[in-house]
Amino acid sequence: MKISLEGKTAWITGAGSGIGRAAVTALVKAGVKVGLSGRRHEPLKETLAAIQSLNGEGILAPVNVADSEAVVAAAEKIRAELGEIDILVNSAGLNLPKRRYSEMGVGDWQMVINVNLNGAYNCIYAVLPHMRDRGDGLIINVSSWAGRHDSYVAGPAYGASKHAMSSMTATINLEEGRNGIRCCSLEPAEVATEILDRRPIPVADIERARMLQPDDLGETIRFIAEMPAHVCLNEVLISPTWNRSHMGGSDWFPGPPS
């Protein structure tokens, strides 16, 4: 059984591209009003234009999710203009081109953790009390395959941030399920988004075509959101059928240094 999302309000971070933008499109088609957050204004404006072409309703709330005070202000803006936030999609994230222990500095590590993990927490912190007061709310944390399976390709900082995000999801359900709040850890394997452009080893077009596509994740997010309130999808682990982590290859399982 699916519920109607018509008239609900969603806050989507990382909404300027990739999974975040695909989530916006899928939810707007279901009648959801959306608040769009991200660091880059121009991509957010493009997403807003796409919403308007669908006759949807949305507003811009640009923010660096690592800035906790700015995040609270963004949430307040969305509530003031669109109503209480029913759905939070934490899709903001990044990775490093130089991601090995031998290449990273302390600042590199902290940047990944501050955006991927602390940024998600900041957004949760901004909505959780209001969801608790209403006895209802859905949080979707876009984690990663690397948040469930250790990955050489993802690197240690990204992997640590996503493992922690998956754990944060579980503890929200442990503490807040009794308050009507549901949290899902969405853990996709490789998705053909612009984050691939930061890979140390370039990804060929033929490989990108075999990967999950952003729209696959957008529709999955809509599916999660359309579950009735008594259903909590704690975790959704999703991969392409041609899963490169199962196939092997020098970028996934490198040999010893030459």
Regions found by a protein language model. Name each.
Residues 144:
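Residue(s) in the substrate-gating loop at a strand-loop-helix junction
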Residues 99-101, 108-110:
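Substrate-binding pocket helix/loop in short-chain dehydrogenase/reductase
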Residues 41-42, 62-74, 106:
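The beta1-alpha1 cofactor-binding region of Rossmann-like NAD(H)/NADP(H)-dependent oxidoreductases
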